[in-house]
């Protein structure tokens, strides 16, 4: 298979794999606006914004490391990477639980504190869903990666229709958490990832190696959040949740254009990892860079 064909194939896998997590918010928009008031939709948008901010911080962006280091590694080394990253994320989740518990006792009143356990549920379920899905990219199971997007799409749709019309914001949170958990479990077993998981494979050197790669990525994630999401918490105090909900709806269509480039970027990273050690990699890389520019 030629490099261009491989890149196109990876793009198709990435698009399908992200249908549930990235595109469902757009496709379900007519239903969300029918089921939820503008204020309620503004609340759900803020919950997702806060969860997205904390996603890479709480997990130290470990999901980005887990699809890089297994490439070309021995099976034992892959087990070390996967088990170490998985256990590390579990420990981070426990620490986050206690931090959130402490924050919940603050006397301040805002969307974050009032819905702190909703945010925690969305955050942690998303951490493990993203980790298990991205691991498939690291072990060259892109077809499984894409199929998980279909699973997440189906579960999100079903749970949304079942829960949101009667439960409102609470139903939205349950549907999001349920879809993340279902997708993570499906990926974990369907990709045979469980075969790579063992507490005995914990490796301090592997953890250090992955953290050296992932921690420098955290500021980039935060800066992207500041660009795309900081206005939400600020506007909450100035214009209220009703106006925030209208703004969230209006921003869905322009956000699709950003997603299109994001899909290409993810597929390009996968292709670069696969081609990196080949002799003519520099020529190929520069050619693609000139084409994009």
Each language-model region and where it sits:
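Interhelical loop/hinge segments that connect adjacent transmembrane helices in multipass membrane
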Residues: 1-7, 117, 143, 185-228, ...
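Membrane-interface junctions at transmembrane-helix termini in multi-pass inner-membrane proteins
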Residues: 4, 8, 69-74, 124-148, ...
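Signature of the first transmembrane helix
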Residues: 5-63, 97, 101, 152-157, ...
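Helix-loop interface residues and adjacent transmembrane-helix termini in multi-pass membrane transporters
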Residues: 35-38, 109, 138-139, 166, ...
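Residues that define the loop-to-transmembrane-helix transition and helix capping
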Residues: 39-42, 83, 113, 142-143, ...
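Alpha-helical transmembrane segments of multi-pass membrane proteins
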Residues: 53, 57, 90-94, 98, ...
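Specific pore-lining/lateral-gate transmembrane helices of multi-pass inner-membrane transport
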Residues: 70-87, 246-293
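Hydrophobic alpha-helical transmembrane segments
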Residues: 113, 117-120, 147-193, 213
